[in-house]
């Protein structure tokens, strides 16, 4: 076959996603909320095999309203290489290269990795060939009003070190030095190498694109830290020997469980 879902599977997907969206966001039926805040898998009968799970097929990025999120870093300009939105210092330790991507859709220029990057969202890129850590200082921020730590991450196409996918640790540290760690792959299926044929130029157009999907980690995963007085967050790339990722929208969010 052509690799596409059958008409019957496509219909089942549409029925679930369209109906549950309206029943939750318009009808207020709370039992559908967990699907739309990324906290549970879709029903197995929505999966192509009819049983599931199939979390790697349906990737949800939750971006709460402004009143329900605290932006740590939106990576909107080169200042994000040194300072986050809270005014805290940003540090890149051990990376072979890093920088900011300022693209504007087509022709996909403006990023030193994953060329072309068809995206209008500014983002950071980080490449490593030994253990490396991104650290963002939180200046004692109080996170008790939030439930989820989120960051949007794309596994960069064009880097053969990424072909088996990527993984990284997320570390929260409080002002007393207590640290707690969560493994990204325990909370997302999105860290895979972009599928498809490579895009070369306007006449040789493949479908391969780097897409930034949310990694949403409940704060309950970080046991033993004082959420009233957080010092820093770290993204530790020590699960694979090498790779490249693109990152944006590091935020704390309130979601409706």
Predicted regions and their residues:
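Substrate-binding/catalytic groove segments of enzymes
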Residues: 28-32, 223-228
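A near-ubiquitous, low-amplitude feature marking generic local secondary-structure context
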Residues: 4-5, 200, 233
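Short, surface-exposed ligand- or partner-binding patches at beta-edge/loop junctions that are enriched
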Residues: 227-236
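Alpha/beta-hydrolase-fold serine-hydrolase catalytic core, especially in secreted/extracellular enzymes
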Residues: 1-137, 144-150, 245, 253-257
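Extracellular ligand-binding interfaces
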Residues: 126-224, 237-257
């Amino acid at each position: 076959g052509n690799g596409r879902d059958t008409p019957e599977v496509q219909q089942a997907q549409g029925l679930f996603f369209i109906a549950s969206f309206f029943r939750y966001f318009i009808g207020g039926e709370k039992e559908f909320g967990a699907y739309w805040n990324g906290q549970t898998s879709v029903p197995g009968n929505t999966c192509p095999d009819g049983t599931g799970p199939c979390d790697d097929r349906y990737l949800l990025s939750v971006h709460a309203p402004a009143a329900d999120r605290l932006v740590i870093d939106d990576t909107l300009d080169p200042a994000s290489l040194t300072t986050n939105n809270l005014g805290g210092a940003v540090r890149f330790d051990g990376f072979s290269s890093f920088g900011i991507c300022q693209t504007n859709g087509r022709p996909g220029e403006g990023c030193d990795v994953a060329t072309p990057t068809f995206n209008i969202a500014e983002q950071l890129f980080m490449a490593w060939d030994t253990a490396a850590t991104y650290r963002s200082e939180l200046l004692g921020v109080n996170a008790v009003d939030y439930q989820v730590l989120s960051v949007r991450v794309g596994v960069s196409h064009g880097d053969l070190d990424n072909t088996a996918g990527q993984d990284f640790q997320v570390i929260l540290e409080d002002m007393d030095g207590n640290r707690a760690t969560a493994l990204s792959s325990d909370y997302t299926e999105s860290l895979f190498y972009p599928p498809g044929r490579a895009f070369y130029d306007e006449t040789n157009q493949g479908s391969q694109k780097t897409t930034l999907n949310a990694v949403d980690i409940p704060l309950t995963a970080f046991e033993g830290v004082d959420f009233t007085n957080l010092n820093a967050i770290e993204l530790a790339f020590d699960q694979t020997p090498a790779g490249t990722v693109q990152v944006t929208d590091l935020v704390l969010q309130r979601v409706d469980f």
